[in-house]
Amino acid sequence: MNTEAKRIAVSGAAGQIAYSLLFRIAQGDLLGEDQPVILQLLDLPQAYGAVQGVVMELQDCAFPLLKEIQVATDPHAAFLNADYAFLVGSKPRTKGMERRDLLAENAAIFRTQGRALNEAASRDVKVLVVGNPANTNASILRRFAPDLPDDAISAMIRLDHNRAVSMLAQRCNVDVDSIADMVVWGNHSPTMFPDYRHARIGRRLVKDLINDENWYRESFIPKVAQRGTAIIEARGASSAASAANAAIDQMRDWIFGSDGRWVSMSVPSDGSYGIAPGLMFGVPVICDGGRYERVKDIGIDAFARQRIDLSVRELQEEADVVNRLFADR
């Protein structure tokens, strides 16, 4: 067993996604069965009691890998020397809330957390933004954590990737691990573009096996994009366990590598595929050695261009709102 514990910060620690996430991290699903961990939990002061309840449950599991649990209401304390951070907490959109107001509240949260990460976290920290609007929240975080490496912050789009892979596997009647080279482009929102034009089962292209363009455009894409809404309607609450699972999948591949597989991550654009540089955007990557490399030179047809541009416009509009918010202060 490795003797030095890794420090893992989790914000929104009293929430349902964190509740599904923390126990899996503590039992080794993220870093493996020989890596001790210290959990550094962050939430609002009014959630302190609920977080203590989670702490008691974690203690009662007697996880051998869990060496310490720290609870903080101050981001600087929660992120101190963190090796990995899952930023799950964010301000959810409530009934009647204007988009500008939602972005304003999250801008304040992620400005504070960005500064705290910049000052306190390990210089090799990997930060995954889960709380929505995840792409724009991650962009705000980068803005206020300028001393961290350019590739230190990612936003989660793996949940959409996993949903797409699962739906394709069901359609083709194969195991999910048979599906390779699936891509989800763009924002974690209904404008996302789940793209199976290059996905394979063995050497065969999924699009040739399905051979149904109408299903692709009119059923598959909207079903992936609206899956979260369907879950809320079915269970009366948003995705929690599947979101936590996707967060672990994305971070684990980022840390240990994706074995040559394409996976989808929202990362700062380098200008490829006509996506504005710096925009936090879902793209295909291959992870290796603790880093990710963008998959280049994928063919973009007219339909794909239209779908990608839709997400680009949405994220640029959100960025414009945020820029005006900060200019006003």
Swiss-Prot record:
One of its GO terms (molecular function) is L-malate dehydrogenase (NAD+) activity. Keywords: NAD, Oxidoreductase, Tricarboxylic acid cycle. Its EC number is 1.1.1.37. It holds the Pfam family Ldh_1_N. One of its GO terms (biological process) is malate metabolic process. InterPro entries: L-lactate/malate_DH (IPR001557), Lactate/malate_DH_C (IPR022383), Lactate/malate_DH_N (IPR001236), Lactate_DH/Glyco_Ohase_4_C (IPR015955), Malate_DH_type2 (IPR010945), NAD(P)-bd_dom_sf (IPR036291). The active site is at H188. Substrate binds at R93, R99, N132, R163. It catalyses: (S)-malate + NAD(+) = oxaloacetate + NADH + H(+). NAD(+) binds at G12, A13, A14, G15, Q16, I17, A18, N106, Q113, V130, G131, N132. CDD domains: MDH_chloroplast-like. PANTHER family: MALATE DEHYDROGENASE. Catalyzes the reversible oxidation of malate to oxaloacetate. Belongs to the LDH/MDH superfamily. MDH type 2 family. This is Malate dehydrogenase 2. It comes from Burkholderia thailandensis (strain ATCC 700388 / DSM 13276 / CCUG 48851 / CIP 106301 / E264). The gene is mdh2.
